């Protein structure tokens, strides 16, 4: 009897991200900045990254951190814990949480505009940072540019990739090298606004771009109805 009570107490003490997610719901991320708010979803195909991002979000880890590296027509990067109290001109990008996440590369998840992906250092396993991430802005590509990218990488793009990169845009040279684990479903204009900010020689915005990140489990039908996202 005591063991059952102890087990029940442990289960009740677990945070929301540690329990089995409800089948008919998804975790809706709200990322607010001084340039507006984005809503994002995390992919089930990358469970380790999804669980980790939910964990950090529930812990309020990202609140007050900066988008410390922004490059127009490429991406915006944030999640460095050292950025919370960084002074103007401080070099950022090396802060972490002391662990990496094994790569979860999926050919169906590529670097289209709005993709949420894990930053990483140069390691042969392509393991991801435990906390730093980037959101793709990229650019629109033509056939010639995509052929060049395929030749350089030695990989072929799917019809879906080619069509998406020619219309929505993205950063195809990152495919297969970094784990894409989510997507912006609302607020792409915010990505554009942040990406075009004046920056220093290290690509840090001259004016701080801070984030607040929260999330909640929402019925998938409601997400589809509110944001037009199809599962």
Where are these regions (language model features)?
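Cyclophilin-like peptidyl-prolyl cis-trans isomerases
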Residues: 16-231
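Sec-dependent N-terminal signal peptides
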Residues: 5-13
């Amino acid at each position: 009897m005591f063991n059952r009570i102890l087990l029940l107490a442990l289960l009740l003490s677990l945070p929301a991200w540690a329990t089995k997610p409800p089948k008919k719901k998804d975790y809706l991320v709200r990322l607010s900045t001084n340039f507006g708010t984005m809503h994002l979803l995390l992919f089930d195909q990358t469970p380790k990254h999804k669980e980790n991002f939910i964990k950090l979000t529930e812990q309020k880890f990202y609140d007050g951190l900066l988008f410390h590296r922004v490059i127009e027509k490429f991406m915006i990067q944030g999640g460095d814990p050292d950025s919370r109290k960084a002074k103007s001109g401080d070099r950022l990008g090396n802060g972490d949480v002391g662990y990496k996440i094994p790569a979860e590369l999926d050919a169906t998840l590529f670097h289209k505009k709005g993709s949420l992906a894990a930053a990483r250092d140069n390691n042969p396993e392509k393991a991801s940072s435990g906390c730093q991430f980037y959101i793709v802005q990229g650019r629109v590509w033509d056939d010639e540019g995509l052929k060049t990218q395929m030749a350089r990488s030695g990989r072929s793009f799917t019809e879906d990739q080619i069509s998406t990169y020619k219309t929505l845009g993205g950063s195809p040279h990152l495919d297969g090298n970094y784990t894409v684990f989510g997507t912006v479903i609302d607020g792409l204009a915010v990505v554009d606004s942040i990406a075009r900010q004046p920056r220093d020689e290290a690509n840090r915005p001259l004016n701080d771009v801070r984030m607040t990140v929260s999330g909640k489990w929402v019925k998938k039908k409601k997400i589809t109805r509110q944001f037009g996202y199809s599962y």
